[in-house]
C-alpha cells in the first residue's frame, strides 16, 4: 500500500457534460469521522445523519448557496471505499460541479484533501476488502459494456460469481496441498494420506472444474473484447456490400469501379450479444496507384491482426489463381472463411460447407451468399460465432479479461504437471506440492490475494476519475 492511499480524496463521480444530476464524492481516508462531520458543517451547514438523504444547500466559503441537492454521509466501514464517505448530489452542469468541487478542496485543505486519481475510489474499495480484484475490474467493465450481454455478465462478476468460482478452486487446491504436505512431513507414520483421501480423484475434480471455469471465462472475454473480422479479397468482389449487409446500413461506398475503397472502413455490430468489429479493406491487386498501394499495405496489416478473415470471391468465377495467391499469404494461425458472393447472379442457393484440406486450413469453411439480396448473411453470422467458440444461451457467463485467461491457463498447466507427479516417490511428491502451490498462486492473482503493485497500478489507472 502506498502512503497516498490514505489521503482524503474528492472527485466528480458523474460523466463529463451536462445532465440532470451531478455527483461529487469525498472519501476521507485517514482524516476519518472528525473531518466528515466538519466538512458536512462547512459544505451543507448541517451535521448529516448517517445513511439518510438530506436536502440541503451546498455553500461557498461565504456561506452563500452554490447549489441545492441531496447530501449523504456513509460512515466507515459501510461505504463503497470502506472509509468515511460524503456524497453531494446536485445539478449536473459542468460549471456548478466545478464550483462545488473547488469548494470541497478549499474546505478540506486542512485535512489534506486532494483530487482523486483515476480509479482511486475503487482501488480503496479493493485495499479495504470491500471488493476483490476481479470485482473491481467488473466495475470498469460494467461501465464500458457495449452490449446487453456484456453488461449482464459484468454484473455477475461484480456480484462475485467469478470470484466465488475462483475461491472454490483455491480451497480445493489448498485441501489437496495439505494432504501432500502431511505425507511429506510425517513419513514415519506410514500413513498413506493421499490414498486414504482419494487424492487422485480430488486432482481430477480440480482439473475438471478448472476447465469449466476457463470455458466460462473464454465466453466472458469474448463478450468483452469481441471479434475482429477483416474483409479481404480482390477489388469489386463485394466487400463493401457485405459490410453494409452485415451492419444493416450503408456504411461503405459501393460502385462497379474497382479500387473504390482506398482505406479501411470499420463498424462494430452485435450478433447474439457478441461485438463483431467488421473491417472493410482495400482490394488486393497489383497497382501503380501510390494511394491504393498504401491502402493495400494497410489491408495486409489488418489481416495480420485479425481474429477471422473473410476471403471474398465472386461466385461466378470461384477461386482463381490470383485468389489462391492471396490465400497463400494469409497468416497460418488466423481462421479463414471463404465467402463466395453474388449468388444472385448465379441463382445458386445460399449455403455453408466445410471445404478444408491440409493441416493449415483443415477447418476452412465456405459460405455462398448474396450481399445484395441478404441471402446467406445469417449463415455467415452463425459461422463467425462458431469460429469464436460462442455457446448460445450461456446464462452463467461472467465477464473476464485477458489476464484472467492467462492465469487460468497457467494454473491449468501447473495442475496438469502435478498430475504427472502424483505417485508416492518422495521427490515426485515434492514436485507435486510445488506445482499445486504455483497453481494456487496463479488463481489467487485473479482475485488479488497475490498481486504486484505494478499490476494494481495498471488496472486502476484505466478507470474514470470518480470511480
Curated annotation (Swiss-Prot):
NCBIfam families documented for this protein: mnmE_trmE_thdF, PRK05291.1-3, small_GTP
UniProt entry keywords in alphabetical sequence: Cytoplasm, GTP-binding, Hydrolase, Magnesium, Metal-binding, Nucleotide-binding, Potassium, tRNA processing
Cofactor(s) this protein requires: K(+)
The protein, known as: tRNA modification GTPase MnmE
Domain named TrmE-type G: residues: 226-389
Gene: mnmE
Family per record: Belongs to the TRAFAC class TrmE-Era-EngA-EngB-Septin-like GTPase superfamily. TrmE GTPase family.
Binding residues for Mg(2+): 240, 261
TM annotation in the entry: none
Amino acid at each position: 500500500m502506498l502512503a497516498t492511499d490514505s489521503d482524503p480524496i474528492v472527485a466528480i463521480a458523474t460523466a463529463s457534460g451536462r445532465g440532470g444530476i451531478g455527483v461529487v464524492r469525498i472519501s476521507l481516508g485517514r482524516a476519518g469521522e472528525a473531518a466528515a462531520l466538519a466538512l458536512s458543517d462547512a459544505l451543507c451547514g448541517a451535521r448529516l445523519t448517517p445513511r439518510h438523504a438530506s436536502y440541503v444547500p451546498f455553500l461557498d466559503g461565504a456561506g452563500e448557496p452554490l447549489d441545492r441537492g441531496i447530501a449523504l454521509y456513509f460512515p466507515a466501514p459501510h461505504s463503497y471505499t470502506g472509509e468515511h464517505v460524503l456524497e453531494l448530489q446536485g445539478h449536473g452542469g459542468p460549471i456548478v460541479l466545478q464550483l462545488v468541487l473547488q469548494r470541497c478542496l478549499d474546505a478540506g485543505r486542512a485535512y489534506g484533501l486532494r483530487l482523486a486519481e483515476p480509479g482511486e475510489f475503487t482501488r480503496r474499495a479493493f485495499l479495504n476488502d470491500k471488493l476483490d480484484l476481479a470485482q473491481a475490474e467488473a466495475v470498469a467493465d460494467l461501465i464500458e459494456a457495449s452490449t446487453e450481454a456484456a453488461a449482464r455478465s459484468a454484473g455477475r462478476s461484480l456480484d462475485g460469481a467469478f470470484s466465488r468460482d475462483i475461491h472454490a478452486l483455491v480451497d480445493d487446491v489448498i485441501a489437496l496441498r495439505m494432504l501432500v504436505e502431511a505425507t511429506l512431513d510425517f513419513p514415519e507414520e506410514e500413513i498413506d494420506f493421499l490414498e486414504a483421501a482419494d487424492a487422485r480423484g480430488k486432482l481430477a475434480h480440480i482439473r475438471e472444474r478448472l476447465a469449466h471455469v476457463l470455458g466460462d471465462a473464454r465466453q466472458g472475454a469474448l463478450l468483452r473484447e469481441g471479434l475482429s473480422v477483416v474483409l479481404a479479397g480482390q477489388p469489386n468482389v463485394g466487400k463493401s456490400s457485405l459490410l453494409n449487409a452485415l451492419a444493416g446500413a450503408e456504411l461503405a461506398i459501393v460502385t462497379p469501379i474497382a479500387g473504390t475503397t482506398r482505406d479501411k472502413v470499420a463498424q462494430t455490430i452485435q450478433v447474439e450479444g457478441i461485438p463483431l468489429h467488421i473491417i472493410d479493406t482495400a482490394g488486393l491487386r497489383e497497382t501503380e496507384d501510390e494511394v491504393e498501394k498504401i491502402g493495400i499495405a494497410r489491408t495486409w496489416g489488418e489481416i495480420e491482426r485479425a481474429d477471422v478473415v473473410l476471403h471474398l470471391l465472386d461466385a461466378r468465377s470461384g477461386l482463381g489463381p490470383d485468389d489462391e495467391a492471396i490465400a497463400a499469404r494469409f497468416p497460418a494461425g488466423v481462421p479463414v472463411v471463404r465467402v463466395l458472393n453474388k449468388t444472385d447472379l448465379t441463382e445458386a442457393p445460399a449455403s455453408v460447407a466445410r471445404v478444408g484440406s491440409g493441416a493449415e486450413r483443415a477447418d476452412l469453411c465456405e459460405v455462398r451468399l448474396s450481399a445484395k439480396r441478404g441471402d446467406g448473411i445469417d449463415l455467415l453470422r452463425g459461422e463467425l460465432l462458431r469460429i469464436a467458440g460462442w455457446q448460445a444461451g450461456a446464462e452463467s457467463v461472467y465477464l473476464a479479461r485477458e489476464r484472467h485467461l492467462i492465469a487460468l491457463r497457467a494454473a491449468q498447466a501447473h495442475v496438469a504437471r502435478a498430475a504427472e507427479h502424483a505417485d508416492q516417490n518422495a521427490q515426485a511428491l515434492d514436485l507435486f506440492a510445488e506445482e499445486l502451490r504455483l497453481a494456487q498462486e496463479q488463481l489467487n492473482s485473479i482475485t488479488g490475494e497475490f498481486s504486484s503493485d505494478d499490476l494494481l497500478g495498471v488496472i486502476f489507472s484505466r478507470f474514470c476519475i470518480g470511480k
